[in-house]
């Protein structure tokens, strides 16, 4: 049987995981503008990202952010001056904090690279 509460895409995490958050995180990390997204993403984009993240069970949010950034269908791209790792660190370590979406995750703190899938 399949555990539908498992922290995996298509189960407790939507598939594809958090597409708006991925779009939001790139310019927040890179500030690239142009074809890569706005230098300062709109508040609407942030609200959509936070709604997507809020819909994921709190215990699965770190995993969802990890799956989002390491997507199989469309992995992150390196940009000049903004590596995939920089984007990943921003998303995993900052999107759940008060300054962004202000959402609880695991007991004892926010997300860290060590508790997200790779």
Swiss-Prot record:
Write out the coiled-coil annotation as residue ranges. none
Q: What SUPFAM superfamilies does the entry give?
A: Bifunctional inhibitor/lipid-transfer protein/seed storage 2S albumin (SSF47699)
Its chief place of residence is secreted
SMART domains the record matches: AAI
Compartment annotation: Secreted
Using the chain's own numbering, where are the disulfide bonds? 7-60, 21-49, 30-82, 50-101
Please name the CDD domains in this protein's record.
Answer: AAI_SS
Q: Molecular function (GO) terms listed?
A: alpha-amylase inhibitor activity; serine-type endopeptidase inhibitor activity
Q: Which is one Gene Ontology cellular component term of this protein?
A: extracellular region
Respond yes or no to whether keyword Acetylation is given for this record: no
Q: Which domain of life is it from?
A: Eukaryota
Q: Name one Pfam family in it.
A: Tryp_alpha_amyl
- Keywords of the record: Alpha-amylase inhibitor, Disulfide bond, Secreted
Q: What does this protein do?
A: Alpha-amylase inhibitor.
- Tell me the PANTHER family matching this sequence: BIFUNCTIONAL INHIBITOR_PLANT LIPID TRANSFER PROTEIN_SEED STORAGE HELICAL DOMAIN-CONTAINING PROTEIN, TRYPSIN/FACTOR XIIA INHIBITOR-RELATED
Tell me the protein family, please: Belongs to the protease inhibitor I6 (cereal trypsin/alpha-amylase inhibitor) family.
Task: Report what the protein is called.
Answer: Alpha-amylase inhibitor 4
- Write down the species: Sorghum bicolor (Sorghum)
Upper classification of the source organism reads: Eukaryota, Viridiplantae, Streptophyta, Embryophyta, Tracheophyta
């Amino acid at each position: 049987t399949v555990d539908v509460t498992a922290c995996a895409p298509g189960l407790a995490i939507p598939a594809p995981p958090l597409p708006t958050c991925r779009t939001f995180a790139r310019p927040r990390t890179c500030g690239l503008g142009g074809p890569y997204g706005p230098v300062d993403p709109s508040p609407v984009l942030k609200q959509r990202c936070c709604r997507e993240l809020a819909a994921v069970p709190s215990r699965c949010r770190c995993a969802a952010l990890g799956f989002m950034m390491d997507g199989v269908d469309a992995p992150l791209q390196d940009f000049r001056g903004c590596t995939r790792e920089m984007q990943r660190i921003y998303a995993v370590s900052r999107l759940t904090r008060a300054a962004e979406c202000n959402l609880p995750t695991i007991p004892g703190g926010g997300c860290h690279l060590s508790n997200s899938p790779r």
